[in-house]
């Protein structure tokens, strides 16, 4: 009997590549959809050639972009999303909404597909203008998640925060798109969304120390080395990449019902805790982070993922160590 086939997007990235490796180790076959070939990903997966096939779609926003590509698949994991990279709305909003819609619509045409898991973000559980005072981020808050797509996002008092605000807005829009599609189209498959906090840990496709800026690890590394979290989302908590990967595979379990949403966030954690690890174990690093940073992370409640997915969160210390150790390996320290 053939192992289940997963159609997966976003596998060229930090989280996607780690998820792909874990799925292959678990015995799944993968049909990996990329915008263009990736040498880093192909090298990473070279030992699994009999379980992997690649398909290339240059424009994921085109009508029928995925037509026929999901045929025979059992599951879909949609990880792809524009990363924070510039101030243009079109870079974020159009791919986030149109690619999500196109993929969900095509999946509805394929009778073999049992479940679609969409990788959303903690950002999709946070109002664009901030959470209410004393609020706790969780899956079922009755907050205002609307996005004014006509907003002039470039008119900001925090220019460095513009890409993150646009990313936040695009995650809200993509999440709303997914659930609105389920409500109106009533697809035959189950839909599950995962909402990780900022993801930290070893990056399987990072090849240089400088490339850390291409993933969420760059946020942690910047804070460590400069002592200043550099964006307006510095209070957003983190989660270890291995926990997020595990959650993706557990979400494929038939016991996880249609309509499930899961916040993925480690418990506790403060910038002081990060600084303590650095000063204790990496004093030679030249880092500027100090324990007197008073800013605490936003409150979260990820008990639903613990109860239903069986999640047990890795500690902040492991996130810090894994990121720093990989950077030191690139520097041959």
Swiss-Prot record:
Keyword list, A-Z: NADP, Oxidoreductase
Residues binding NADP(+), per UniProt: 167
Use case: The sphingofungins A, B, C, and D, show a limited antifungal spectrum of activity but are especially effective against Cryptococcus species, fungal pathogens causing opportunistic infections in human.
Conditions for induction: Expression is positively regulated by the sphingofungins biosynthesis cluster-specific transcription factor sphG.
This enzyme's EC code(s): 1.-.-.-
UniProt GO molecular function: oxidoreductase activity, acting on the CH-OH group of donors, NAD or NADP as acceptor
Alphabetized Gene3D superfamilies for the sequence: NAD(P)-binding Rossmann-like Domain (3.40.50.720)
Function: Ketoreductase; part of the gene cluster that mediates the biosynthesis of sphingofungins, bioactive molecules acting as sphingolipid inhibitors via inhibiting serine palmitoyl transferase (SPT). Does not seem to be involved in any biosynthetic process leading to the production of sphingofungins, but might be connected to a regulation or resistance mechanism.
Protein family membership: Belongs to the NAD(P)-dependent epimerase/dehydratase family. Dihydroflavonol-4-reductase subfamily.
Protein name: Ketoreductase sphI
Organism (species): Aspergillus fumigatus (strain CBS 144.89 / FGSC A1163 / CEA10)
GN (gene name): sphI
């Amino acid at each position: 009997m053939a192992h289940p086939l997963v159609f997966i997007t976003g596998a060229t990235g930090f989280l996607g590549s780690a998820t792909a490796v874990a799925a292959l180790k678990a015995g799944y076959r993968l049909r990996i959809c990329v915008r263009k070939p990736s040498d880093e990903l192909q090298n990473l997966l070279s030992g699994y050639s009999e379980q992997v096939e690649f398909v290339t779609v240059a424009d994921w926003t085109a009508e029928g972009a995925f037509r026929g590509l999901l045929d025979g698949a059992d599951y879909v994991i949609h990880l792809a999303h524009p990363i924070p990279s510039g101030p243009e709305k079109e870079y974020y909003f159009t791919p986030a909404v149109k690619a999500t819609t196109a993929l969900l619509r095509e999946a509805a045409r394929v009778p073999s597909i049992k479940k679609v898991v969409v990788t959303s973000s903690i950002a999709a559980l946070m109002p664009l203008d901030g959470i209410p005072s004393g609020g706790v981020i969780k899956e079922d808050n009755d907050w205002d998640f609307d996005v004014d797509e006509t907003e002039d996002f470039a008119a900001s008092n925090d220019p460095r925060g513009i890409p993150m605000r646009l990313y936040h807005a695009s995650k809200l829009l993509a999440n709303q798109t997914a659930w609105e599609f389920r409500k109106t189209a009533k697809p035959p498959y189950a839909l599950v969304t995962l909402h990780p906090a900022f993801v930290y840990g070893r990056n399987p496709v990072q090849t240089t120390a400088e490339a850390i800026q291409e993933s969420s690890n760059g946020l942690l590394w910047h804070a460590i080395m400069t002592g200043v979290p550099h964006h307006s989302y510095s209070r957003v908590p983190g989660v270890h990449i291995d926990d997020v990967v595990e959650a993706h595979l557990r979400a494929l379990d038939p016991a996880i019902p249609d309509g499930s949403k899961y916040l993925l966030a480690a418990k506790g954690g403060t910038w002081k805790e990060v600084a303590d690890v650095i000063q204790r174990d990496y004093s030679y690093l030249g880092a500027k982070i100090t324990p007197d940073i008073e800013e605490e992370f936003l409150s979260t409640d990820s008990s639903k993922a613990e109860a239903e997915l069986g999640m047990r969160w890795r500690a902040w210390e492991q996130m810090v160590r894994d990121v720093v150790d990989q950077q030191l390996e690139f520097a041959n320290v």
